[in-house]
Amino acid sequence: MFLFSRKTKTPISTYSDSYRAPTSIKEVYKDPPLWAWEANKFVTPGLTQTMHRHVDPEALQKMTKCAAQDYTYKSSISGHPYLPEKYWLSPDEEDKCCPSYLDNDRYNTWKTSPCSNYWNKYTGCLPRLSKDTGMESVRGMPLEYPPKQERLNAYEREVVVNMLNSLSRNRTLPQIVPRCGCVDPLPGRLPYQGYESPCSGRHYCLRGMDYCTTREPSTERRLRPLCSQQPTECVALRSPARNAMCCYNSPAIILPVSQP
C-alpha cells in the first residue's frame, strides 16, 4: 500500500522493506519536433479518402445480366406476388361492388365513400341495397326527438301575447273609484294586458307591471280639471309622448297642489 505526499508526489510505502527516500519529480520541457506534415486526428474515418478497390469487369457484367434476366422473368409471370396487378379487379367485378358515385362520375367516389377507386383498386364496398329495403330499415329505426323546450321562442311568445291581448279587449276593464272626484278614472289592472306602439309597430306586453295603458302612447295627454270637492287641488300629470321606441308608458301621477 502506498501513500502519496502532496508536496513531493513521491510514493511512501507503509512497509519498511520497500522504503525508499523521497525524491522530487523533475519535468524537463522539450520543444516539439518540426514536422512538415502532421496527421489530423480530429477527422473522422468516414471522411478520409477511400482507397480504390479492384473491380472485375467480367463479374460486374455478369451481375447486370442476371438482374436483367430476373426482371424480365418476373414481368412475364402474370400472377407474380411482387406486382400490384394481382390485386386489381376486373371491370365485371368492379361493377358488382361499386360504391355510390356522384353525378355518375367514377372518379368522384372519394366525395361520397371512404374507399376510392382512384387511389385503391380493390375496394371493399358491399353492393347497394334496394330502395324499398332501405326505407324499411329507416322506418324501423327509433328516432330520438330533441327535448322539449321549456321557454318559448319569440314567435310563440308573440302568439301568446296577441291571444291574451285579444281576450282582454273583449272583456270590460274594471274601473277604479275616482280619486278626489276626478273625471277620468284610472284604468284597471289585468294580468296580461298589452298595447300596440305606432312608432315601432309592435305589441308590448305589460306583464308584471302595476298599470296597463288603454290609450295609444302617441296620443296627446291633457291635464285633468282641478277638483272642486276638496280643499287641496289635484292635478293629474302624464308623461308626454316620446319619439323613440315606446316600450313603457308610466301611469298617471296625482300630485296635491297647495295654494300659498
Curated annotation (Swiss-Prot):
Would the keyword Nucleus turn up in this protein's UniProt record? yes
Q: Please give the knockout or disruption phenotype noted for this protein.
A: Deficient mice are viable and have normal fertility.
A molecular function annotated in GO for this UniProt entry is: alpha-tubulin binding
Signal peptide interval: none
Question: What induces the gene encoding this protein?
Answer: Up-regulated during cilia assembly in IMCD3 cells.
Main location class: cytoplasm
Query: What is one GO biological process annotated to this record?
Result: flagellated sperm motility
What domain of life is recorded for the organism?
A: Eukaryota
Q: Name one Pfam family in it.
A: SMRP1
Please give the PANTHER family that the UniProt record associates with this protein. Answer: SPERMATID-SPECIFIC MANCHETTE-RELATED PROTEIN 1
This protein's assembly is summarised as:
Microtubule inner protein component of sperm flagellar doublet microtubules. Interacts with alpha-tubulin.
Family the UniProt entry places it in: Belongs to the SPMIP6 family.
Name the UniProt record assigns to this protein: Sperm microtubule inner protein 6
Which species is listed as the source? Answer: Mus musculus (Mouse)
